[in-house]
Design a protein with these regions (language model features):
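Conserved hydrophobic/aromatic pocket- or pore-lining residues that grip, position, or stack substrates
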Residues: 7, 25, 38
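Single conserved hydrophobic/aromatic residue that forms the stacking wall/gate
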Residues: 1-12
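Structured, soluble regulatory/oligomerization domains located on the cytosolic or IMS-facing side
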Residues: 30-32, 37, 41-182
Length: 182
């Protein structure tokens, strides 16, 4: 029994190592299991440093049985935002806001511009409290802190564009109508 157990443990470890799904230093995510930076890959388990700086020891079978997202190997980072504008925003304002956001992204050196990389600034839906514009674009950087900086700059630019067009962001609200009884 011991030989079979050791053999299966080695098989799982070898699968983790041979498939090269990740290596020491990689930022990985396994849904419902772990997210963090790989510190070591051992015989039976892998040690991952979580983003709260705690260490987690994960049995290797978890990596063999689950999808592993290796964020270190990403080529770009995606921004996928829903921008909610008030219902009083006119069609003309919506067109201008969408165009100016798209123009900003196309002119900025921070974003990927290629035929095979999606850039979309489109009205997505008429939500309960807003007209929603979905923005999807990809940054050139894959580094987390740089990505946060690009998002911050983009958010401020979008706010400027919305204000310049004399529109406002929506917030969840409820309208109450009271009927008069005659």
């Amino acid at each position: 029994i011991y030989d079979r157990l050791v053999g299966s443990e080695m098989c799982i470890r070898d699968r983790v190592l041979v498939e090269r799904r990740f290596q020491v230093g990689d930022w990985i995510y396994v849904e419902g299991v772990i997210e963090g930076t790989v510190e070591s890959i051992g015989f039976r388990s892998t040690v991952v440093r979580r983003f709260d700086k705690s260490l987690a020891t994960i049995p290797n079978f978890q990596f063999a049985e689950n999808a592993v997202i290796n964020n270190t190997q990403t080529t770009n980072r995606r921004i996928n935002w829903m921008i909610g504008l008030e219902y009083r925003t006119t069609s003309e304002q919506l067109k201008n806001i969408k165009k100016e956001i798209e123009d900003y992204i196309k002119k900025s050196d921070d974003f990927v511009k290629s035929e095979d990389t999606l850039l979309s600034v489109k009205i997505d839906q008429f939500a309960a409290s807003s007209i929603d514009i979905r923005l999807i674009c990809f940054t050139k950087t894959k580094h987390f802190q740089e990505w946060l900086n690009v998002k911050d700059t983009l958010a401020l630019e979008i706010k400027n564009i919305v204000e310049k067009n004399k529109a406002s962001f929506a917030f969840p609200s409820t309208s109450v109508y009271v009927e008069k009884n005659s």
